[in-house]
A protein has these predicted regions:
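Hydrophobic alpha-helical membrane segments
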Residues: 1-333
């Protein structure tokens, strides 16, 4: 039975051994929008009003999400009480839609233009939406699996190249990997129609990218079944692991930075500047440490669950094709 403390310890150890490559991989994931996209938000959140006196009025533009831009273009107001279905969808489908279309957010900006008119703009916007979905399904999903392969390999050997994250593309397994991730996404979208099912299945299907990373030739349905099998009895414990990592490395740093930024800003008379610096500091912490550390910790969790399946000679454990991924990680830093 795995313990949270040991999982975190292994994650830190793995990060310290390959920190440069891990930072590079996580940065690529954030830059493309495959994962950790929120970690780079601070780049565009530095307040330009920070260079002005705090008592000067500055009019700032309110940024809308891709989902909100789409509803605005369709003239749908989910808050007016006449569209309860759209209001409910915004809570579940909205964030998923924003994630899938993140790489092509620029096209959604067309929807916000005051002079938006003409079929050309409409076609461009539709092409942007279709392109964003295509890019997310067929490219970003493979990058996500490739990143899992990188972290699995970096767990058992040093000096791993970031080229490992591109293995789904150049080893002839791209089609099967993307099919598996697409099937997982379809299941998740269907489960959003339920209240309790979605968070449960979110954890049940969590190991699918790792399974496909280890065995890119695994059948999508078998990868999903094996993930459910691995997470059986571990969903709550995994949720607690997520919660502790969030509290320790997201909530508390943000809260502390906010308090320090506001306090120092009040003392110096530059509240906006200090708060902006605090936001950048938290963002850099995520990019330079937290993302890599958490990814390494989740890789250690997969290795522990994988070993438990092998020890029990569980069904579908034959899908684990790389024995080294089940070995104990090196202890040296």
């Amino acid at each position: 039975m795995w313990e949270r403390r040991e999982i975190k310890k292994q994650g830190k150890r793995q990060f310290l051994r390959n920190w440069a490559a891990m930072i590079a991989v996580c940065f690529l994931l954030a830059f493309t929008g495959a994962e950790f996209a929120q970690s780079a938000d601070f780049i565009g959140q530095f307040n330009p009003a920070a260079v002005l006196p705090d008592d000067q009025v500055v009019i700032q533009e309110v940024s809308l999400s891709n989902w909100e831009l789409l509803l605005e273009w369709l003239h749908i107001d989910p808050m007016d009480g006449t569209h309860p279905m759209w209001a409910a969808a915004g809570q579940s489908v909205g964030p998923l839609f924003d994630t899938l279309t993140a790489p092509f957010s620029a096209f959604f900006a067309l929807l916000e233009r005051s002079d938006f008119a003409g079929w050309l703009d409409i076609l461009l916007a539709c092409a942007g939406i279709a392109g964003g979905v295509w890019f997310s399904v067929w490219v970003l999903s493979a990058l996500t699996v490739g990143a899992r392969r990188f972290f699995l390999e970096s767990r058992v050997r040093d000096n791993i190249s970031i080229a490992a994250m591109f293995t789904p593309f150049y080893r002839g397994n791209w089609w099967n990997v993307t099919k598996g991730m697409l099937l997982r996404s379809v299941y998740m979208i269907l489960w959003t129609c339920t209240i309790i099912g979605f968070p449960v299945k979110l954890y049940a299907y969590r190991m699918v990218p790792y399974i496909l990373a280890e065995n890119p030739q695994a059948k999508p349905t078998e990868a999903i079944q094996l993930s459910r099998q691995m997470m059986n009895g571990n969903k709550w414990r995994c949720f607690v692991l997520d919660l502790t990592l969030y509290l320790h490395w997201a909530f508390l740093p943000t809260l502390l930075a906010s308090i320090l930024g506001t306090g120092i800003g009040m003392l110096t008379g530059r509240i906006v500047l200090c708060q902006s610096i605090a936001t950048v500091a938290v963002g850099l912490l995520s990019l330079l440490f937290v993302n890599g550390y958490k990814s390494a910790a989740y890789t250690a969790l997969y290795a522990a669950l994988r070993q438990a399946q092998r020890d029990a000679d569980a069904p579908l454990s034959s899908l684990f094709t790389v024995p080294a991924f089940g070995e104990a990680a090196p202890t040296g830093a």
